[in-house]
Amino acid sequence: MFTLKKSLLILFFLGTINFSLCEEERNAEEERRDDPEERDVEVEKRFLPLLLAGLPKLLCFLFKKC
């Protein structure tokens, strides 16, 4: 139970950091844009796919069930 709480806390912490970094990046890009058509372009989130790709390995390591 403790390892589950610990891993969820780590995921929450990483998600919070990811969200704040993406928000800062999005704000910086919006300041640089001059063309109104470019404002509709979504900001690519690069950290989330990496986190999701490593999640099974992390869970396997934490719970020792592969």
Swiss-Prot record:
Keyword tags: Amphibian defense peptide, Antibiotic, Antimicrobial, Cleavage on pair of basic residues, Disulfide bond, Secreted, Signal
Signal peptide region: 1-22
Q: Which GO BP terms sit in this record? A: defense response to Gram-negative bacterium; defense response to Gram-positive bacterium
Gene Ontology cellular-component annotations:
extracellular region
Q: Which residues form the propeptide?
A: 23-44
The record lists its disulfide bonds as 60-66
Quote the tissue specificity entry. Expressed by the skin glands.
Q: Where in the cell is it found?
A: Secreted
What role is this protein assigned? Answer: Antimicrobial peptide.
Q: So what family is this one in?
A: Belongs to the frog skin active peptide (FSAP) family. Brevinin subfamily.
Mind telling me what this protein is named? Brevinin-1CDYd
